């Protein structure tokens, strides 16, 4: 038969090979460093309050500065990724993160630390905008949900490592928080070096009429000895006619996000991301301090945060497989949001140590499972010409919620307490269910179906 599959279909039918795993590990490492950074930032908040004599409101501002930078980072990186290529952006985002994280360890007051954390957030935001669109265009459809979901689970691996760092390093002395930031920044430098050898997305290359380069990437992904079940193997000569390119009408942001049929998709995704990140980052940044205010020692609060991160890792891994099951993306996401609302309510009414740990671990499991699915589901809603912009702005709007979450806790904690905060979060977690109903199911669909 003639080889007339589109490029995306060729990738979807490709066997999963060594190159896929190499690319996945190198790209997904960005999520690990994001989790490492944000969890260390939450852990050192207690030390910063003492070192810089911060009140709750100012501590909330400090906790939100990286998230504010994240909003800027996703907006810039998403647009750059669609215009200049995924590799262009992914090659530099970790460099920004590494340098600024190391510099933040030298901060001498809260203002300097906040400014540097804002700049760190720009690098972290760039990672979030580009990694999953990049992987979505390279990973075969039948395992895309699992590998993209597991990419986000790397965030929790980083958070678990950070919890150990927080537990061991921060209490060691007044310099502990500085050393924790150095530990967060140094490993990222190595990943940045090897990441420069990643290939460009073949779909992006084809859409920008670089067909020979796209074919070369396909050959790299699927060498002849791994493609014997394709008809014909991708190792055979491929003409430019084999590639289906998607003309993008404009680089105008309004067209990228709000043209038909993307207006409905964009609005729904922004609602979903805003509310989940408001809850998640409020929970993540303030959890150790909230537990201390509940009566736990600093060490005990960090131990509980570590156990909740273990639960979060299991949630991310589990959700990665659930979304590739017959249940599909939409039903899985709705189910997890509903259960998250219940878990948050249970956390709000828990008074015993075991009750707080059980409800908190369940909430961590479900929230991280949701992120694993949303980082798969969101780029699948867009086409290659607006995919990283769509992912970036959805995540960016979400991080506006992520900025509000820690600030909200800092402002109202003394008035309504931990119980009131998590009761409110329970309501916030039910709102996205309605928005998800307006999105299409994408399980096992070619990434370029639109």
What residue ranges belong to the model's regions?
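Transmembrane-helix signature of 12-pass secondary carriers
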Residues: 1-450
């Amino acid at each position: 038969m003639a080889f007339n599959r589109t490029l995306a279909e060729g990738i979807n039918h490709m066997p999963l090979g060594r190159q896929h795993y190499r690319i996945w590990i190198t790209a997904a490492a960005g999520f690990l460093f994001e989790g490492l950074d944000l969890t260390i930032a939450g852990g050192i908040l207690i030390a910063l309050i003492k070192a810089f004599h911060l009140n709750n409101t100012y501590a909330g501002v400090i906790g939100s500065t990286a998230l504010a930078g994240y909003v800027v980072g996703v907006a810039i990186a998403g647009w750059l990724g669609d215009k200049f290529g995924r590799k262009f952006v992914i090659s530099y985002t970790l460099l920004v993160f590494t340098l600024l994280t190391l510099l933040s360890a030298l901060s001498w007051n809260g203002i300097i630390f906040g400014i540097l954390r804002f700049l760190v957030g720009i690098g972290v935001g760039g990672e979030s905008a580009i990694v999953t669109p990049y992987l979505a265009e390279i990973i075969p459809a039948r395992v895309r949900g699992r590998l993209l979901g597991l990419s986000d689970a790397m965030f929790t691996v980083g958070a678990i490592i950070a919890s150990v760092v927080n537990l061991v390093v921060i209490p060691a002395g007044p310099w502990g928080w500085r050393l924790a930031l150095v530990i967060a920044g140094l490993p990222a430098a190595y990943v940045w070096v090897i990441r420069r050898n990643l290939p460009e997305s073949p779909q992006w290359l084809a859409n920008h009429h670089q067909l020979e380069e796209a074919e070369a990437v396909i050959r790299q992904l699927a060498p002849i000895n791994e493609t014997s079940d394709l008809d014909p193997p991708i190792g055979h000569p491929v003409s430019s006619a084999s590639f289906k390119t998607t003309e993008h009408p404009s680089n105008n942001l309004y067209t990228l996000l709000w043209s038909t049929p993307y207006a409905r998709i964009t609005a729904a995704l922004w609602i979903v991301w805003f509310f989940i990140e408001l809850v998640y980052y409020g929970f993540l940044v303030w959890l150790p301090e909230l537990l201390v205010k509940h009566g736990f020692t600093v060490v005990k609060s960090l131990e509980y945060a570590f156990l909740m991160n273990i639960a979060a890792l299991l949630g991310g891994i589990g959700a990665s497989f659930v979304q590739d099951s017959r249940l599909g993306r939409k039903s899985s996401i709705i189910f997890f949001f509903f259960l998250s609302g219940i878990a948050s309510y249970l956390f709000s009414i828990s008074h015993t140590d075991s009750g707080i740990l059980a409800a908190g671990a369940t909430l961590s499991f479900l929230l991280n499972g949701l992120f694993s699915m949303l980082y798969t589901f969101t780029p699948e809603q867009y086409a290659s010409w607006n995919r990283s912009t769509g992912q970036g702005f959805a995540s960016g709007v979400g991080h506006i919620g992520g900025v509000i979450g820690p600030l909200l806790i800092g402002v109202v904690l003394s008035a309504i307490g931990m119980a009131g905060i998590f009761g409110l979060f329970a309501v916030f977690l039910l709102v996205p269910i309605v928005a998800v109903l307006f999105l299409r199911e994408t399980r096992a669909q070619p990434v370029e179906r639109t």
